[in-house]
Structure formats: structure tokens, C-alpha cells
Regions:
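Helix N-cap at the start of a conserved alpha-helix in ABC-type nucleotide-binding domains
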Residues: 167-169
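Catalytic Walker B motif of ABC-type/P-loop ATPase nucleotide-binding domains
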Residues: 156-159
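Conserved ABC ATPase signature
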Residues: 131-135, 139
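A short, proline-enriched helix->beta-strand linker immediately N-terminal to the Walker B motif
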Residues: 150-154
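Helix-to-loop junction immediately C-terminal to a conserved catalytic motif
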Residues: 48
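ABC ATPase NBD coupling module
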Residues: 64-78, 108-109, 182
Length: 211
């Protein structure tokens, strides 16, 4: 289980999170739901190590991950970014194997086998040699998910996974996330869309701006 205990975060004089505690059950999909400016993306960035908490603890199965960097936690916590962040000069397969070979020190052969397995799972086996400009928004989203999964994380975080897509694709994204449910992986999804949240959530955490 992933837990945050009594965490706070400010930017300058503006307090974003104030003494927040939540648990994220293993094998479940937890949705962090709320309006823009409510702190949901800040919370996700702190969980993933992209930002640091001002105070409080982050625990994964009792292991203290508080304020460790995203790179230090990359084998434990994966992130699917809102804008996908694919490298345009690399093809799909190269995008996916880059981190496992550099961070996890996997051989190129092992990383490629894992990447192809992820692409097959996500229905992209025929796109491994394509570049990002050749992909639709939904395909880029699935490549970003495959890249995160290739790091074999125990926690997979999504930042507004439908915001960069056409409205009609939100159901496809929900189906992908539901199909990835596993007893060994916690999924955390940030969204402002209550309809999307209802489709996927085992647990919902609502956040509001601090007044």
C-alpha cells in the first residue's frame, strides 16, 4: 500500500496542500478529483518525486520514499504525463526501452522484449517503428503508458490522461486503465472530469483549493 501522512506543500506564500493524509490500496485505481488549482497535480508530482513535500511522509509498503527524486523512485513509481513527453527523434520502441536500459541497466535485448510485450498489451505492436508525429493522440497516450509500464513500477500515476485528447477518446483511455488493473500495481489518476472518474475509480479522493 502507498500512504501519505500529514503532508504539506507551499509555493512561496501560497499553501497548496495542508496536513493531508491518504492511502492508495495496492491493486486498486484511486482517482484524485478536483478543479484546477486544487492541488491534485501537485500531490501527484510529490508522490512521484518530481516535487518535494515541505513536511510529512510518503510510504510504500512501509518503505520511506519521502522526498526521494523521481529517478531514485523510477523502478517503484511510474508517471504518464499529461503531454506524453515522447522524444520526437526516437521511434516508439526506442522511447520505451530508453529508461530501462539507462536506469534499470537492462540489456537492450531484455528491454526490447519487455517493450514489445507492453506494446502488444496496448494494441500497438504495429507501431514500434513509428515516430510520435505519425501517431494519433490516443496512440501517443498508450505509448506513454507502455513506457511507464516498462519500468515495472509498483505505482503508476496518470496526470490528466484525457485532457490532451479528443473528448470521444476518454472511454478508450478508461478501458486501457481498467485493463491494466493488477494485484501488484497501484494506479493513481488525477482528473477534473467526474464522468471519467466514475468509470474507473475504486476509490476517489476529492481535493479543493485552500482558501
Amino acid at each position: 500500500m502507498l500512504e501519505i501522512k500529514n503532508v504539506s506543500k507551499s509555493f512561496g506564500d501560497k499553501k497548496i496542500l495542508d496536513n493531508v493524509s491518504h492511502s492508495f490500496p495496492m491493486g486498486k485505481i484511486t482517482v484524485i478529483l478536483g478543479p484546477s488549482g486544487g492541488g491534485k497535480t501537485t500531490l501527484l508530482r510529490c508522490i512521484s518525486g518530481l516535487e518535494s513535500f515541505d513536511k510529512g511522509q510518503l510510504l510504500l509498503d512501509g518503505e520511506d520514499l519521502t522526498n526521494k527524486s523521481h529517478q531514485a523512485n523510477s523502478g517503484k513509481i511510474g508517471v504518464v504525463f499529461q503531454d506524453f513527453q515522447l522524444f520526437p527523434h526516437l521511434n516508439v520502441l526506442e522511447n520505451i526501452i530508453l529508461a530501462p536500459t539507462m536506469v534499470l541497466k537492462k540489456s537492450k535485448e531484455e528491454a526490447t522484449d519487455t517493450a514489445r510485450s507492453m506494446l502488444g498489451l496496448l494494441g500497438l505492436s504495429d507501431k514500434e517503428e513509428a515516430y510520435s508525429f505519425e501517431l494519433s493522440g490516443g496512440q501517443k497516450q498508450r505509448v506513454a503508458i507502455a513506457r511507464a509500464l516498462a519500468m515495472e513500477p509498483r505505482v503508476l500515476c496518470y496526470d490528466e490522461p484525457t485532457s490532451a485528447l479528443d473528448p470521444g477518446l476518454s472511454g478508450d483511455v478508461a478501458e486501457v486503465i481498467l485493463n491494466l488493473k493488477s494485484p501488484n500495481v497501484t494506479q493513481i489518476v488525477v482528473t477534473h472530469d467526474p464522468v471519467f472518474a466514475e468509470k474507473i475509480a475504486d476509490k476517489t479522493i476529492r481535493v479543493e483549493p485552500i482558501k
